[in-house]
């Protein structure tokens, strides 16, 4: 094949191209490796989980959960149940994360256990709809809350919201492209900010309770249903709530960038999930100390309405706090979304350019640019609550398949070293609830669930054409090589080199790009 650019193998890391040619700005003969750096400690690991979970969901989902629950009491039950199910899933992911210590999360585990097609379908749905939709929803929530004080009596103009959302997205794409350390510092800082914002809501809510303002929480009122509850509606309420908990598995996407992942991955999960469940439950309790169910359902910005009713002159604090919270959520989603694209390209399931990192910053710039572009497209179309239903259904489908893989791995490879091995009842209990949720979601919203399945299945022909079919015409190979060379020169990126042993912290040294000469013309 013409040219020297190496295509990633179907499994494992791509090998560096032989005899690379020096390019301007690099140091010929440098012996150091270009690789992803291990800069994520326990604190940053916790903030990645908390920062990704606590984004826009707690400010959007309460309305959807209450609408489908039919009562305050049942809505609160859904939030507690959501935290419990998330805890079960996170325990299973902790076992998978230390047994298969690869970045890529669900995608890496499904590919390892079920093979390339299953892994590609999960990757396809995640890259095409799950991540860009979640990022679009969080970005639009950010802009709506920032603009709320400017348009206090109406919904902010759609054009203004989209422009501000895009500006925020591009800013954070630049930050993540420039430095892993900058990205994690932003995550640490804004996670602390969002916890302070929710602590303010919870604190004001507790003050309301101590003053006796909890009429909606009294049992006689809390379980006064304004519609006949059904299992199908309860399943939809849980799907809405699950959007607020999405992100609990994101730390598994950056395992290779963690310091001592075998210890810090499970520790971060055990610290973060109970904390988030506590915060979510008491935030919703606080909402109901200030608003009736009807007021909450009619509110376009729940936290803003809460602030207007209880904070008076300081009500401006709430939209600012929510904006800071969602800003951190955008950063966290970008960070993990780009690592998923990076892992997929490294396995040969996405264009090889996405498996490359900048020679100095050691960041996956091509993957970040793809993430930004895909989110921008999704941002231009779609209703928020409909998008949440699509994403929640596909998310839960992928979670269940991954945890089913845990049981299959136990059976196939019983001798595999597992520093963490959860009780068998935990994955079984999760899968029982998972099956229940999906069945009743199909019954209640067949269109939404059907579209979700179709989105996943559209990846089948793409897999066979793009991945499985190896003997493509030479013109296709020349085109892809040419585009890869062009992308390398534009982004100044190189394949990361395999680590012979655990990499120490430190600056990423410059290295050589794989040959940037153009592919030779066929003879």
Curated annotation (Swiss-Prot):
One of the record's GO molecular function terms: L-serine transmembrane transporter activity
Membrane topology: Multi-pass membrane protein
Metal-binding is among the record's keywords: no
Entry's Gene Ontology BP terms: amino acid transport; D-alanine transmembrane transport; D-serine transmembrane transport; glycine transport; negative regulation of brown fat cell differentiation; neutral amino acid transport; positive regulation of synaptic transmission, glycinergic
Reactions accelerated catalytically: L-alanine(in) + glycine(out) = L-alanine(out) + glycine(in); L-serine(out) + L-alanine(in) = L-serine(in) + L-alanine(out); L-threonine(out) + L-alanine(in) = L-threonine(in) + L-alanine(out); L-cysteine(out) + L-alanine(in) = L-cysteine(in) + L-alanine(out)
Free-text tissue specificity from the UniProt record: Expressed in brain, heart, kidney, liver, lung, pancreas, placenta, and skeletal muscle.
Segments traversing the membrane: 40-60, 72-92, 113-133, 268-288, 310-330, 362-382, 388-408, 424-444, 448-468
Keyword tRNA processing applies: no
Primary localisation category: membrane
Pfam hit, one: AA_permease_2
Region (Disordered): 1-28, 499-523
Compositionally biased spans, kind Pro residues: 15-25
One of the record's GO cellular component terms: membrane
Subcellular location: Cell membrane
Keywords, sorted A to Z: Amino-acid transport, Cell membrane, Disulfide bond, Membrane, Transmembrane, Transmembrane helix, Transport
Subunit structure: Disulfide-linked heterodimer with the amino acid transport protein SLC3A2/4F2hc.
Function: Associates with SLC3A2/4F2hc to form a functional heterodimeric complex that translocates small neutral L- and D-amino acids across the plasma membrane. Preferentially mediates exchange transport, but can also operate via facilitated diffusion. Acts as a major transporter for glycine, L- and D-serine in the central nervous system. At the spinal cord and brainstem regulates glycine metabolism and glycinergic inhibitory neurotransmission by providing for glycine de novo synthesis from L-serine and glycine recycling from astrocytes to glycinergic motor neurons.
Family: Belongs to the amino acid-polyamine-organocation (APC) superfamily.
Protein name, UniProt field: Asc-type amino acid transporter 1
Organism of origin: Homo sapiens (Human)
Gene encoding the protein: SLC7A10
């Amino acid at each position: 094949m013409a040219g020297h650019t190496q295509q990633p193998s179907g499994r494992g890391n791509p090998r560096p191209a032989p005899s690379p040619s020096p390019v301007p700005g690099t140091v010929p003969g440098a012996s150091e490796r270009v690789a992803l750096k291990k800069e994520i400690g326990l604190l940053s690991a916790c903030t990645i989980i908390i920062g990704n979970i606590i984004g826009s969901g707690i400010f959007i989902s309460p309305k959807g959960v209450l609408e489908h629950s039919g009562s305050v009491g049942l809505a609160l039950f859904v939030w507690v149940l959501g935290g419990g199910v998330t805890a079960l899933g996170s325990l299973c992911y902790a076992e998978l994360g230390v047994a298969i210590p690869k970045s890529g999360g669900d995608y890496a585990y499904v590919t390892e256990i079920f093979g390339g097609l299953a892994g590609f379908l999960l990757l396809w749905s995640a890259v095409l709809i799950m991540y860009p939709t979640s990022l679009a929803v969080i970005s639009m929530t950010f802009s709506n809350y920032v603009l709320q004080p400017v348009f206090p009596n109406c919904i902010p103009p759609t054009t203004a919201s989209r422009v501000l959302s895009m500006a925020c997205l591009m800013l954070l794409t630049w930050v993540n492209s420039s430095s892993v350390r900058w990205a994690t510092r932003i995550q640490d800082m804004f996670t602390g900010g969002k916890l302070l914002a929710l602590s303010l809501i919870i604190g004001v809510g507790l003050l309301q309770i101590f003053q006796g303002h909890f009429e909606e929480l009294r049992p006689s009122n809390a379980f006064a249903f304004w519609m006949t509850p059904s299992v199908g509606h309860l399943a939809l309420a849980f799907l809405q709530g699950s959007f607020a908990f999405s992100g609990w598995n994101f730390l598994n996407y950056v395992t290779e960038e963690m310091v001592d992942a075998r210890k810090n991955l499970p520790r971060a999960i055990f610290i973060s999930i109970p904390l988030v469940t506590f915060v979510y439950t008491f935030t919703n309790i606080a909402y109901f100390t200030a608003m009736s169910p009807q007021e909450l359902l009619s509110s376009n910005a729940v936290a803003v309405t809460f602030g207007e009713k209880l904070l008076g002159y300081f009500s401006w604090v709430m939209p600012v706090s929510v904006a800071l919270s969602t800003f951190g959520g955008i950063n966290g989603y970008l960070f993990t979304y780009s690592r998923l694209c990076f892992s997929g390209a490294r396995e040969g399931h996405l264009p090889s350019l996405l498996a490359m990192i900048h020679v100095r910053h050691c960041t996956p710039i091509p993957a970040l640019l793809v993430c930004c572009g895909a989110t921008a497209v999704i941002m231009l179309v779609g209703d928020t609550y409909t998008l949440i239903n699509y994403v929640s259904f596909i998310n839960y489908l992928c979670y269940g398949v991954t945890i089913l893989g845990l049981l299959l791995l136990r059976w196939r490879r019983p001798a595999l070293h597992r520093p963490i091995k959860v009780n068998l009842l935990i994955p079984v209990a999760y899968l029982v609830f998972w099956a229940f949720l999906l069945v009743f979601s199909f019954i209640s919203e067949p269109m939404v669930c059907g579209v979700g399945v179709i989105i996943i299945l559209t990846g089948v022909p793409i897999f066979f054409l793009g991945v499985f079919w190896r003997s493509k015409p030479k013109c296709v190979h020349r085109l892809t090589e040419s585009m890869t060379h062009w992308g390398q020169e534009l982004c100044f990126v190189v394949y990361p080199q395999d680590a012979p042993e655990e990499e120490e912290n430190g600056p990423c040294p410059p290295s050589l790009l794989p040959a940037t000469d153009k592919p030779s013309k066929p003879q």
